C-alpha cells in the first residue's frame, strides 16, 4: 500500500470512527477562543453574510454567560489517525462544519505540540523505582524498543506536550500579538517553534522538561507528569533564559494569587513590568468537575488574558483553548509525529515541519467529561492588564476557581491559608494528579 493509499484509508476510517464535530447547537451561542468572541450567524443568513470579526478585548460579564446546559454530552473524540496533510484534505471534504471561518483560522493559528518519535535519546533513570513508575505499555517499550533511552514520548508525554503548547502560545501572543494568523511573519513563528524542537539544545524541549522533572520534581524519564510538575518546569526553564522575555508565577499548593508575590516576579525591585504568565494548578472535584465551578471555568477562557487550560481529561491531557456553552475545544497531543528537528538557521525549517505544529481539525469535549485536575494559564502583559484581570476574576458567576488577595500571609510569617480556601477549591499534589492524568 502506497503512502497516498494509506492516507486515504486513514481518512476513511477517521470519518466514521472519529468524526469531526459540527456546529449543531440550537441556541446560536457564540464561541470563545482565548478571550475572543465569534458570533454564530443564523443559518439562513450564512450564505449572504460573512463571519463577523472577533470582538477585540471584549468578553461577557459573568452574569450574561449562557446557563442552559445540554442534557446529553455530545460525542467526544479520543485519539486520531490524521496526518498534517490528511487534516487539510479532510477539512476540504467536510467543508467547515458550520463553524465561523474566523474561529477556524484562529484555532489553526495556535501552536499544537504532540507526541514525537525518533528524537535524540533521553537517558533512562538508574533509580530502581523508575521502572515501577511507568505504565505497563511504556515499561514494555523501554525494555523492548527504547533500550538505549527514550526516543519517543508516546504513552507518557501528553502533559508535557500540553504544557509546551500552552507556553508556546503565550510566547506567540507576546511576540506577534493576539491577531496573528498563519502566513504572516513566518520566520518569527519558526523562531518560536525552534525553542520547542525535540533536541536537548532547544531551551523548552521535552529533554529539558524531563531533565528538570527528574532533578527537581521527582519525575523519572518515561513517567507521567501532572499539572504541578509541568508548571514548575515551565517556571524553571523560563527563568533559566539569560534574557527572559517572560516570567512565570505559579500558585503552588493553592488557587490563591497574591499581588505582592506576583509583583515581586513581574517587576522586582520596582523595575519595569515584565510580561508574566500566571499558572494556576487546581483540582475542581474528585472524579469530575463539581458543577458549582462550571461557569467560572468557562469564563476563564473568555478573559482576554487567557492562554488556555492544560490537563482536564480522564486518563490523558489536552490543551483547551475554546468554549461554546458547556463544550470545550481542545488540541490533542496524542498523535505521534516525526521529531521536530533543531535548526541553527530557522529558515531551514520546512513547510512540513511547520504544518506539523498546526491543525484546523476541531475536537470538542463536554465539561461533564473533563477531569478536574488542570493547569489554568493567563498572560499578564502590563499593570493595566493585571488590574483588568484581577477585576474580571471577581465578577465570576458561581464559585470562583481563582482568588486574588493583596498579600501572601507567608510573606509576613503568618503561614496561614486565606479563610475558606480549603473549603472552596480542592487543590492537587503530584501524587494525586498523576494517577488521573495519564498519557
From Swiss-Prot:
Polar residues biased stretches: 64-75
Region (Disordered): 48-92
GO MF assignments: cysteine-type endopeptidase activity; protein-phosphatidylethanolamide deconjugating activity
Protein EC: 3.4.22.-
Principal subcellular localization: cytoplasm
Known catalytic reactions: [protein]-C-terminal L-amino acid-glycyl-phosphatidylethanolamide + H2O = [protein]-C-terminal L-amino acid-glycine + a 1,2-diacyl-sn-glycero-3-phosphoethanolamine
Assigned keywords, A-Z: Autophagy, Cytoplasm, Hydrolase, Nucleus, Protease, Protein transport, Thiol protease, Transport
Classification via InterPro entries: Papain-like_cys_pep_sf, Peptidase_C54, Peptidase_C54_cat
Enzyme class: hydrolase
Biased composition (Low complexity): 76-87
Subcellular localization(s) per the UniProt record: Cytoplasm; Nucleus; Preautophagosomal structure
One GO term of the biological process aspect: mitophagy
Gene Ontology CC, one term: phagophore assembly site
Active site: residue positions: 158, 332, 334
Ranges that cross the membrane: none
Tree of life domain: Eukaryota
Function in brief: Cysteine protease that plays a key role in cytoplasm to vacuole transport (Cvt) and autophagy by mediating both proteolytic activation and delipidation of ATG8. Required for selective autophagic degradation of the nucleus (nucleophagy) as well as for mitophagy which contributes to regulate mitochondrial quantity and quality by eliminating the mitochondria to a basal level to fulfill cellular energy requirements and preventing excess ROS production. The protease activity is required for proteolytic activation of ATG8: cleaves the C-terminal amino acid of ATG8 to reveal a C-terminal glycine.
Family label: Belongs to the peptidase C54 family.
Matches recorded under PANTHER family: CYSTEINE PROTEASE (PTHR22624:SF49), CYSTEINE PROTEASE ATG4 (PTHR22624)
Record's protein name: Probable cysteine protease atg4
Species annotation: Botryotinia fuckeliana (strain B05.10) (Noble rot fungus)
Gene this chain is encoded by: atg4
